[in-house]
């Protein structure tokens, strides 16, 4: 329930007025102590069934804002406030935080409908898929929640298929919706399996200056295989590759991002065959474009010839009409 904000100074009455005393007392208190953030109020759709997830809305009358409960819970940049009343089962979202999340969503496009306002992101650190909550469900993304611990998160369809990722997302408590802010910078708590894999990677980096040959890389891959993390490692690599097109198409991509992507693609021997095939594709497209240009050139010549012929017909008709007029006048 929204609480009244303190009376403003210009509305304070005379000093002797009983209405003025609460206002004066309020003004004497520090602003941070007295002011309470306005909360979203719970509403239930009277025409929806009671057991459906979309019948619960939260509404802020002062800002004319309404949002589904799940859209609020699963939004990546939004958390609930400290609950002032533990007996109140309603969610505790303050209006200003919701407005900031709406503003953040204006920069994010939904992977499913391609419209802005997509504040629900895949929980995997390197995945940049964003959705509207109900679009995510249509795209077979998997919401995961623990109401007791206040954890609400979502995995896209691709990453929900892999047990290690799904397990780590299910039990890591990084996206709490009650009691603490959630980082947007990607500081995820890592499960033991991921930490083990990262330790291997760090060891490879430390050894890179001294051993750049297969004596380090081969054992690393074998250890990943023994630990059951080889698929996870490859999925991380694929996630990085899958994120490249979206980054390149984004108008806000920085020059350093272009340099990083270019280095990853052109300096990696893994893609040598890919570039050979890509060169062949370029030659094929050049040939197709040349053929199309030749066809267009022939079509243009035909149209110009047709235009000239039509002009000749028009000139002949005008001459005939003029001759007929002169003949009629001579009589």
UniProtKB/Swiss-Prot annotation:
The keyword Metal-binding applies. It comes from Homo sapiens. Pfam families: zf-HC5HC2H. The gene is PHF11. InterPro entries: EPHD (IPR034732), PHD-type_Zinc_Finger (IPR051188), Znf_FYVE_PHD (IPR011011), Znf_PHD (IPR001965), Znf_RING/FYVE/PHD (IPR013083). This is PHD finger protein 11. Its main location: nucleus. GO terms for molecular function: zinc ion binding. A zinc finger (PHD-type) spans 108-160. It is found in: Nucleus. Signal peptide: none annotated. One of its GO terms (cellular component) is nucleoplasm.
